[in-house]
Structure formats: structure tokens, C-alpha cells
């Protein structure tokens, strides 16, 4: 099992190229199921979750090829499927497999999708997906660990309806967007998620011929069409990777330009970093961060977009750990999302968990130790902590990191970090 060995204490300087967003690429790979034409995706990140999704749709019969000279380009052709099924063996490590449910139902009238795995950060139920697709006319049963869905006899398409979810659900909104694009009539999504990745998926679907209005707001209208065609689409830049590098520079100090970063997708995080003492400037296709000395600790509360993202909570906590002053971090989205805390404490952080909140007292220095990653964003937070800790930090179980970060250690090395992958 690979590990990362980090020698802390170096400031960071240079340029980092931000990759395409994992949370946009995964639904967009599934969107290729909606057409028999060729779909070309550009700026697709090289991640374990993306590799798993490609394996999944290939298993269904989709032709999917990465460009040899342009590895960020993936060409997809779902002319016919051999099997509209997402088996447990392929999806047990990745929750995003549920995104195949809507497209398969909409185009082929049937789908068998394993209940998803992939995250250790609390229950993320798929009941909202099932309720919404049932409202559109699908018959769905859950048995033996699978969601088995089909259209009723004699019904050729899903039906447009109004769907109001009990809570804001990102993957639910994406599933309904894709399913409704080929449904009969109009679908209205109330309480829709507003994340930039959803807007990017909607932009791709519109290029394919979908009729969608209101994406980026809480109310999305989709007028179903009989067929969608192919398109070429560039995956939006990863705002969480961007935020992770911003926190790393704020913690370690330095002057770094993030190419392709979108400041307008990270307002809540950038506001907190500026309050902490970092100087951040942004323009078309770049963000620059300059940080010197200890930052000031910042309290925050995670909420749905455009609020502070839960996917940035752990990374900002790594910054707070060595910042001046005390802070309170409140997690409102997921349970079990403080699993990185025990590992940070091993490095010398002062953190107390009080229900849904973590109360932190910044320390002047952390000291290197062996720590274990527990989930994707927790692993990133431990890397940031390792960059500022005295001595050597060894981060174990970094397969979590590989699920969501494209060559993170190489990018950090490129801006001056002393970090290397240790092959087991």
C-alpha cells in the first residue's frame, strides 16, 4: 500500500495546473449513456474514481478511450449496451455509481445498479433518487443490495413531473437532470443543488440538445426531448483541488499561482483565507495566493453551495491547527466527518470534538509522525499538516487521496514541497 513521506518546513512557490473536477467528470461520463452518438470529454482528471467509472461503463458495453497524446481527453460511444447493470464488484469503492441509474432508465428503460459504497463519512442515502425516479414513472425495487429499475409495460419514456427533494442532494439533482432530459414533458426540480459541477453538467447536456433552464438556482426546468446527440465538452476546473492548494500555501507560506482556478466557485473559502491573512488575487483562468507568517484562525460552518463546502472542512482545519487563536468548525452536511481529528492530534494539534463542532486552539508548531488517511479529504488535510510539521510525516492509506487528487505529490513537489511516494 503506497504512502506519502513529507519533510515539513518548506515554503511553496511557483505554478500549479488545476485539473478537471472529479465531481463534474463522473456525472458527465454517465451522461454519455444518454446518446448513441460520440461524446468527447476534455480535461478529464486521472483519478481512481474516474478509472472506476470508465471500467463501469465499459462493462456495460460503452466504448471509452483515453487519448494517448492527450490523456485528459476521453472519447465515449454508447451506441448499444451489452448490459444496463452496475455490479457491486465495480462500484463498491465509489458512491458515484448511482449516477448511472437515471441515464440508463431514460435511454434504455431499465437499470440494475448496486447500492453504492466509497465513503466512510456517514450515511448518504439514495432514497431521494429512488423517490424522484418513481415519481417520473419508474418501477424500482431494492433487493439483494441492488436497485432494480424499469419502465412499466407499454411505457416508452419517463414522464416529466415536479420533484421536490427532502434535502438538497447533489447527485440526486444530477440524476434527475439527466433522466429528465429524455423524459416526456416538463420536469421541474425544486430544492435543487446549485454546485458549479451541476451547472457544468447542465451546460454539457444543453450542448447535446437538452432544454434546461435555471441551473445554478434552486429551481431547474427541463423540457424533455426525444433524443440527444453527441458533443465535445471541457470538464470545469476542480474547485476542491483549488481550495486544497490554497490552504496548503496559506499554511506553509509562499507565493503560488493556480492556473485554471475559478475564484467565483470558491467565494466562501477565499473570503475566509483573506480574513486569515492571505493575499489572494484572481483573474480569467488563474488565482494567486501570497501568504507569510502565521495565519489567524477562522471559525466557519459547512453548508450547501454557495456556502462553505464540506469537502474543504478538513483542509481548512489543517490551516487552523497552526494558526493564531482559537476557532470552532461546525459540520452540518455529513456525520463522521471529523475522522481526521485523531490523526491531526497525533501531529500535535489541539482539537476537541463537541457534537457537530470541532473546537480548535492553534499551536505554533506540529511535529511529524505516522498518520493514517481515513477518507479522501481527510487525507488531503494530513498532507497539508505534514507540509508544516517539523521533521518527517508519513501518510498511510493514500489510496483515498488517489480517488480524488490528480498527481497531488508531483504538483506539490513542483512548487517546492519535500514529498515523495513510498511504494509498499
From Swiss-Prot:
- The main enzyme category here is transferase
Under catalytic activity, the entry for this protein gives: phosphoenolpyruvate + UDP-N-acetyl-alpha-D-glucosamine = UDP-N-acetyl-3-O-(1-carboxyvinyl)-alpha-D-glucosamine + phosphate
Give the record's pathway.
Answer: Cell wall biogenesis; peptidoglycan biosynthesis
Q: Record's superkingdom?
A: Bacteria
- Outline what the protein does: Cell wall formation. Adds enolpyruvyl to UDP-N-acetylglucosamine.
InterPro entries documented for this protein: Enolpyruvate_Tfrase_dom, Enolpyruvate_Tfrase_sf, MurA_subfamily, RNA3'P_cycl/enolpyr_Trfase_a/b, UDP_GlcNAc_COvinyl_MurA
Stretches that traverse the bilayer: none
Q: What is this protein called?
A: UDP-N-acetylglucosamine 1-carboxyvinyltransferase
2-(S-cysteinyl)pyruvic acid O-phosphothioketal-modified residues are 119
The Gene Ontology CC terms held by the record are:
cytoplasm
Please give the family membership noted in the entry.
Belongs to the EPSP synthase family. MurA subfamily.
The EC number(s) given in the record are 2.5.1.7
Gene Ontology process terms (BP): cell division; cell wall organization; peptidoglycan biosynthetic process; regulation of cell shape; UDP-N-acetylgalactosamine biosynthetic process
| Cellular localization per UniProt | Cytoplasm
Task: Provide the binding site for phosphoenolpyruvate.
Answer: 22-23
Q: Name one GO molecular function term.
A: UDP-N-acetylglucosamine 1-carboxyvinyltransferase activity
Q: Which UniProt keywords apply?
A: Cell cycle, Cell division, Cell shape, Cell wall biogenesis/degradation, Cytoplasm, Peptidoglycan synthesis, Pyruvate, Transferase
Could you say which residues bind UDP-N-acetyl-alpha-D-glucosamine here? 95, 124-128, 311, 333
Its main subcellular localisation, reduced to a broad class, is: cytoplasm
> Where is the catalytic site?
119
The UniProt entry, under Pfam families, shows: EPSP_synthase
Its gene?
Answer: murA
